[in-house]
Amino acid sequence: MSKVHVFDHPLIQHKLSYIRDVNTGTKEFRELVDEVGMLMAYEVTRDLELQDVDIETPVTKMTAKRLAGKKLAIVPILRAGLGMTDGILSLVPAARVGHIGLYRDPETLKAVEYFAKLPQDITERQIIVVDPMLATGASAIEAITSLKKRGAKNIRFMCLIAAPEGVEKMHEAHPDVDIYIAALDEKLNDKAYITPGLGDAGDRLFGTK
């Protein structure tokens, strides 16, 4: 069964309060999402493997630690997931970035993939799928399903806020995928918006509301 990691770090919660605030403008919203993405990435990458390397400092020779094992790939779900990507890249600049685009079918209400561009060695990488919100879970589930169909195995999902309904659906669909969130909100409303939530993350990031 997948685990849900909820971050209670004071800096994350402080910045999240401004992200939620309806009075926060597009520029500040974008900067805050980027910053929280970076802060969350510290914890999401906590268990990356290290290996010993011999180096020489200006004073003496020593054995130091560097990242080893599987390389990292970040896969934002278009378009809102783009807002969290640069924050992670600021910590792990060598990571590759893939993209998955989804839209909701107006009749079936299911998420349908319309675009996917991934690193060629995606099967060999540890993957962080990013999207600011986990509401119904449909988009995240479809994105992860798409990655698995392409051979990806080591996948994590990272978002700012989640609804219990979305978390439950993710557990059912992908019990092997851990979920990392800044806040677990109360519920979905009758329009499938997370409550209290932050509104439409894509519109607020790109000023299109």
From Swiss-Prot:
Reported cofactor(s): Mg(2+)
PANTHER family hit by this protein: ADENINE PHOSPHORIBOSYLTRANSFERASE, URACIL PHOSPHORIBOSYLTRANSFERASE, CHLOROPLASTIC
Pfam family for this entry, one: UPRTase
CDD domains reported in the protein's UniProt record: PRTases_typeI
Residues that, per the record, bind uracil: I194, G199, D200, A201
Protein function: Catalyzes the conversion of uracil and 5-phospho-alpha-D-ribose 1-diphosphate (PRPP) to UMP and diphosphate.
Residues that hold 5-phospho-alpha-D-ribose 1-diphosphate according to the record: R79, R104, D131, P132, M133, L134, A135, T136, G137, A138, S139, D200
Similarity comment: Belongs to the UPRTase family.
Enzyme Commission designation: 2.4.2.9
Keyword Transferase: yes
GO molecular function terms attached to this record: GTP binding; magnesium ion binding; uracil phosphoribosyltransferase activity
Keywords of this entry: Allosteric enzyme, Glycosyltransferase, GTP-binding, Magnesium, Nucleotide-binding, Transferase
UniProt activity-regulation remark: Allosterically activated by GTP.
Catalytic activity of the protein: UMP + diphosphate = 5-phospho-alpha-D-ribose 1-diphosphate + uracil
Comment on bound cofactor: Binds 1 Mg(2+) ion per subunit. The magnesium is bound as Mg-PRPP.
Entry's Gene Ontology cellular component terms: cytoplasm
Top-level taxonomy: Bacteria, Bacillati, Bacillota, Bacilli, Bacillales
Enzyme class: transferase
Pathway as given in its UniProt record: Pyrimidine metabolism; UMP biosynthesis via salvage pathway; UMP from uracil: step 1/1
Name of the protein described by the UniProt record: Uracil phosphoribosyltransferase
Disulfide bond sites: none
Species for this entry: Staphylococcus aureus (strain NCTC 8325 / PS 47)
Gene Ontology BP, a term: UMP salvage
